[in-house]
Amino acid sequence: TVKNVTGQELNQSMTDILRGFNRLMKYKKVDKNLIGFLRATEVTYSKELDSYHPHLHVLLMVRPSYFQAKADYINQEEWTELWQKAMKLDYTPMVDIRAVKADKGKGLKGAILETAKYPVKPFDVTDKKTDFTDQEKLQIVDDMLTGLHRKRQIGFGKLFKEIKKQFDFDDLEDGNLVQTGEDTEGTSSGREIVAVWNWDRKNYFVR
């Protein structure tokens, strides 16, 4: 994450974050272990601070050796340092990275789906629990639409690009981060994706 910003600063902050993320993925120690990634944007609003908190949720697929080789593994502190470097920050940002673990009864697939749902949850300004005035709602929607203008909300990298090609995931990239209460509620069907490790080619392939 980065520090909170005003509505006027949101668009530039999002540009900086996406550029910083691209730099992070190209760092040698990150790139050599990376099989694929899913990057999603989330922006939350603080009424108390009257500011926005732009941040990324990222799902990384790494090589099997990542957790076994000391030279390859990147701990929490090092991820924080790499993100600070990529963003060119003069303060220590907050980075929370965790291994996806299988939940009892759900399996690894369930753990991945559980992790992946957070990046794409919408920010609902019409929720009565938010207690926003009508003027505040209008301002928040305007700030969010302006701040996220021409910003890709979800990005796929490496193996996940192949997954996107083989399955109809274009609607994810065109999703809405701001809910105004006018959308009808519906259900979505899930897809099971199997990536097989090829030892000869040292890479994953979608089956």
Predicted ranges, named:
Residues 1-52, 62-207:
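Right-hand nucleic-acid polymerase module
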Residues 58:
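Cys/His-coordinated zinc-finger cores
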